[in-house]
Structure formats: C-alpha cells, structure tokens
C-alpha cells in the first residue's frame, strides 16, 4: 500500500509541474521562453518588483510578528484571547476581500483620504500602488507568523535569560544572544513561508494592482487576455522555482540552526 500511495502522491504533484515545464518550452520561443523571463523588460520588471515586495513584506512581518508573538505568549491580560482572535481573523479572508479592505482604507474614497482631506493636506490615496499591495500582503502575513512565533516562544527557557542577566547582560544583549538564537528556526521557517505566499499571492494583487505589475498578474494576463499559454507556463515555472528554492534553503538553514542551538 505504501508504494502505490507514494506513486499516486508523486504523480499528483509532479505530473502537473512536468506538463507546465514542457508547455513553457514548446511555444514560439521554444526553451528560450525561460530566458525571456529575465531578458524581456516587462517580465524582468514584474519579477524584480515581486521579489522586492515579498522581501519587504517578509522583513516587516518578522519584526512585527516576532515582537508581538513573544509579548503575547509571555503576558496574560484582560482581552488577550479576544486580541488573538482578532489578529488571526485575516486568515479567514480571501485575497480579494483583503484587497477590498485596503481600498476602503486607502482608496479614492477611503478613510485615510477623507482624514487627510479634513486635515487640509490633500486626499492621500495609495491603495493602487506598491504601498497598497504592501499593506494588503502585510495584513494577511502577520497572523501566520505570529502563531508560529508564539509556539516557539512557549518553549523558551527563562532560566537562560536569567543566567545571562546575572552575568551582566542588558536587555538588548539578552535578546540578541539568547532569545533570537532560540527563535531563529521559527523565524527562518515562517519567513520563508511568508515570502513564498507573497510571491504567489493573486487575489489581493488582482484587486489592487491596476497600475503596477507583479508576477502573478502578468501570468494571468498572458494566460487569459493574450492567450500566450507557453509564456504563462514559463513564468509560472520560474515563480515556482524561486519559491521552492527559498523554502528548501530555509529548511536547511533552520535545521542547521536548530542543531547548533541544541
């Protein structure tokens, strides 16, 4: 039973990828379609924009969720459970809904624009820019990372921190030398997932990316509007390779970090 199950699982995951790779190499450009991703300005710009946006979202998410996760795990206060429920609420929303919420906040008739207009500094609108995408991606990324960090923070040994303090280490030194190394595997793993999710996010980008191009939207355009199936497949494979490599590298680094810490 094990071998058939593995075979079916491998076929389920690998055959679509193999088919996608073949389609990407059989269009008008042939295998050169993969090279065109980095030599054609519009594709390269979309790729770089997506990578930069994903890196920025990941870095910001790790800082915010890292601090919030440790704080929420170590402190009990009135309303904590309600706050946790509210923080995890974005997990229930599809990307299109999150994009709509960003528009309600920072769109042409959004709350932020109305407030800035009342203050006499003009109507601030950024929902349809890279800043709007950043806000939307950050909104759905933070809950995922907070839950992971809280689980890791629960396993922190307070005795190690007390020992460091007794040796004269200040608060920042304790964070740098004790807390961060202990949380490193969780930070690396959750950061990689955050990056991969941001790279492939479509619903939020579809709602907000009217004036900017990110890779999922370019793939959608090539596939549906231009009927350029081969180029859409090549772009999809490149996107998949980048995210797969990131996740594989994070597993290796997180494993090595955990082994060193242990």
Name the predicted role of every residue range:
Residues 1-27, 39-154, 178, 182-202, ...:
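Membrane-water interface segments at the C-terminal ends of transmembrane alpha-helices
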Residues 156-160:
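Short glycine/proline-centered loop/turn elements that form peptide/ligand docking sites
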Residues 26-27, 104, 201-227:
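Glycine-rich helix-loop "coupling/hinge" segments at transmembrane-helix boundaries
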Residues 164:
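The alpha-helix within a helix-turn-helix
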Residues 256-262:
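Short, Lys/Arg-enriched, Gly/Pro-containing loop segments at transmembrane-helix junctions
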Residues 78, 169-171:
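Short coil/turn motifs that cap or connect alpha-helices
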């Amino acid at each position: 039973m094990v071998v058939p199950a593995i075979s079916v699982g491998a076929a389920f995951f690998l055959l679509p990828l193999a088919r996608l790779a073949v389609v990407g190499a059989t269009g008008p450009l042939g295998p050169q379609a993969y090279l065109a991703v980095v030599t054609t300005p519009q594709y390269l710009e979309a790729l770089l924009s997506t990578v930069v946006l994903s890196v920025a979202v990941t870095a910001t998410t790790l800082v915010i969720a890292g601090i919030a996760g440790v704080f929420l795990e170590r402190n009990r206060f009135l309303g904590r459970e309600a706050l946790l429920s509210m923080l995890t609420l974005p997990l229930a929303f599809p990307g299109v809904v999150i994009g709509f919420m960003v528009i309600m906040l920072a769109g042409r008739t959004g709350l932020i624009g109305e407030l800035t207009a009342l203050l006499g500094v003009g109507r601030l609108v950024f929902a349809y820019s890279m800043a709007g995408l950043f806000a939307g991606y950050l909104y759905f990324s933070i809950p995922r990372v907070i839950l992971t960090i809280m689980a890791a923070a629960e396993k922190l040994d307070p005795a190690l921190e007390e020992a460091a303090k007794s040796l004269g280490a200040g608060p920042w030194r304790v964070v740098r030398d004790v807390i961060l190394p202990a949380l490193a595997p969780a930070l690396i793993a959750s950061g990689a997932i955050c990056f991969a999710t941001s790279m492939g996010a479509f619903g939020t980008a579809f709602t907000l990316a009217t004036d900017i191009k990110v890779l999922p939207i370019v793939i959608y355009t090539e596939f549906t509007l231009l009927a350029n199936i081969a180029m859409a497949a090549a772009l999809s494979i490149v996107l998949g390779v980048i995210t797969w490599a990131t996740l594989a590298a994070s597993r290796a680094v997180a494993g090595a970090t955990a082994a060193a810490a242990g």
